[in-house]
Every structure is written in structure tokens, then in C-alpha cells.
Amino acid sequence: MHLLTLENLERKDIENILNDAIYFKKNRKSENILKEKTVALIFESPSTRTRISFDIAVNELGGHSLTLNTGETHVSKKESTKDTAKVLSRFVDVIVARVKEHSTLEDFTKYGNVPVINALSDLSHPCQILADLLTIKEHKNKLSGLKFAYFGDGNNVCNSLILGCAIMGMDIFVATPEGYEPNEKFVKMAQQIIDKQGEGSITITDDAIICAKDADVLYTDVWVSMSDKNKNIDEVLKIFPPYQINEKLLSYAKKDAIVMHCLPANRGMEITDEVIDGEQSVVYDEAENRLHAQKAVFKYIFSK
């Protein structure tokens, strides 16, 4: 059982994961799901929240974590992913990997024989979205029927958000400049889920106000990630400011709307200090919930 994207999860699966996460949040060291298990944590790019939350999750679940930074090992450098996957499968019980290319994760699942969890790739960020859904549920007491508004680059986080929100029956609005839309495959999958369930909707627009109007949740991410070297920075700084979450944009949303950002944030760019530090911001709850959601993911993986 692997978790590379959310596409193979049904609503009941996510509901179970969120319920388990709520339990783990109330009972920090309650279960030894990973007793006598070793988890390899592989990082091809810098990480704060992902690394710390997974490390703590493994240890609080009774397991042992082994962190492998690619700059210090042969992983993704001098050794093929195929060989790395086969060798690690002899040593560890789970592979958690934060990678630059999603294909690396697919190779781990193809050539290894232990569960693989996507801690972030260029295509998807499923664990972040499970933490996001947990945060929304905590603050709104439901998911189905909410208007979820995303602003900015249609990146890996956006891809996973539209999938997760579609599964949970939410109305998804994505405001992004032309040419920066989310991955078409994920948009199609989200629409198929919506059609099948007969609940929710998805709208991709370049109009931030349409996106923000009467929204229950406003969400943004960095306009340019640390690993994205293909974007024209000057162009980004020119065309993205209308998608900044600021007090004016927030005024179009519902009065009790919450504001989210997966962090790290470039304050003054995709979001202002006033908003991220304001009463409607839940970014630190969101960050904390990475720990609890990821514990629930381990439980889900080993219950299959």
C-alpha cells in the first residue's frame, strides 16, 4: 500500500484518516503502530515542517526514523533509483520521500517492496492536503458544501487540493493567471469524481474576486518554489500581484472565512502580514496538523 497521490482514496478513506488524526491529536503517544519498524526519510530538497513532523510522528508511534539527505548519500546521485529502492527495501519497513520529480516515487514503488509515502513531489503533496482538510474540518465542522478558494500558482499543492476537495464534496475555485493553471490530469480527475458523486464543483478562472466571493476558505502558496527554476521571475512578479490574499480580497469572502497557507510564506507577496497574522488565519493550526495527519497515514498504510 502506497500514498503517492490522493486519487486512489475514497471519501470514507479520507474520513477515516481525519478521524484517526483527531484521535492522535488528543492522544499524542497512544499507539505503537510502528513498533520495531524503521522508516527511511529521504529528502532531495530542504524541509522544515515535513522533516520534523514525520520524524516526530515515527517516534511517537514507536518506530525509528532514519533521515537520508541526498547530498550525503548515493541516493539520486551516483546510484540508480532502482538500486536504491531494492537495497532500502532490505533494510527499512517504509520509505517516506520528498523528491524533485514524481517519477522517483513511482520508481520506488516499482522496484521496492515496502510502502512508499509521498512527502512532496513536483506533481503532488497528499500529506499536506490531508492536514489541510483536517484543519478545515476543525474550524468549520464539515467539509462537504464549503466553497474553497485557491489563489496563485497551479502547483503541486493546488493539484492535490482540487483532488482532495473534490473527494470531500466541496465547491472548488482556483484563481490563477493564464498559463499557470493546475495540472490538467488532476482537473479531469476532480471533475470525474464530482460527476460520479453528484456533489461539489470545480471552477478555474483568472478572476480573483469571483474566486473570493462568499468563500469559506481562502488558500494560497508561494508563487515560485525553491526548486522551480523554469519560471520567469520578472513575469511572475508582474502578473501574480492580483492574486495576493490581502485585506481587500478577504473582504469579498464570508465574514467567518478562514485563511490558509502551507508555509513557508513569502510575506508581502502571495499573502500580506496583516492577513497571515490576522484572526482569520489558521496557518499554525495547519502546520501542527501535519504531525497528526501523517500519524493517521501510517495507520492507514499498515491497516491495508
Curated annotation (Swiss-Prot):
Identify the InterPro entries for this entry.
Asp/Orn_carbamoyltranf_P-bd, Asp/Orn_carbamoylTrfase, Asp/Orn_carbamoylTrfase_sf, Asp_carbamoyltransf_Asp/Orn-bd, Orn/put_carbamltrans, OTCase_ArgI
Q: What is its EC number?
A: 2.1.3.3
> Taxonomically, what lineage is the organism?
Archaea, Methanobacteriati, Methanobacteriota, Methanomada group, Methanococci
GO BP terms = arginine biosynthetic process via ornithine; citrulline biosynthetic process; L-arginine biosynthetic process
From which organism does this entry originate? Answer: Methanococcus aeolicus (strain ATCC BAA-1280 / DSM 17508 / OCM 812 / Nankai-3)
| Record keywords, A-Z | Amino-acid biosynthesis, Arginine biosynthesis, Cytoplasm, Transferase
What does the UniProt entry say about where the protein is found? Cytoplasm
SUPFAM superfamilies, per database record: Aspartate/ornithine carbamoyltransferase
Residue positions binding carbamoyl phosphate: 47-50, 98, 125-128, 262-263, 290
User: What's its job?
Assistant: Reversibly catalyzes the transfer of the carbamoyl group from carbamoyl phosphate (CP) to the N(epsilon) atom of ornithine (ORN) to produce L-citrulline.
Q: What is its main location?
A: cytoplasm
Q: Does the keyword Nucleus apply?
A: no
**Gene (UniProt):** argF
Recorded family membership: Belongs to the aspartate/ornithine carbamoyltransferase superfamily. OTCase family.
Name the top EC class. transferase
Can you state which reaction this protein catalyses? carbamoyl phosphate + L-ornithine = L-citrulline + phosphate + H(+)
Which Pfam families does the UniProt entry name for this protein? Answer: OTCace, OTCace_N
**Domain of life, source organism:** Archaea
| UniProt: L-ornithine binding residues | 156, 221, 225-226
Its recorded name reads Ornithine carbamoyltransferase
This protein's GO cellular component annotations are: cytoplasm
- Quote the pathway field: Amino-acid biosynthesis; L-arginine biosynthesis; L-arginine from L-ornithine and carbamoyl phosphate: step 1/3
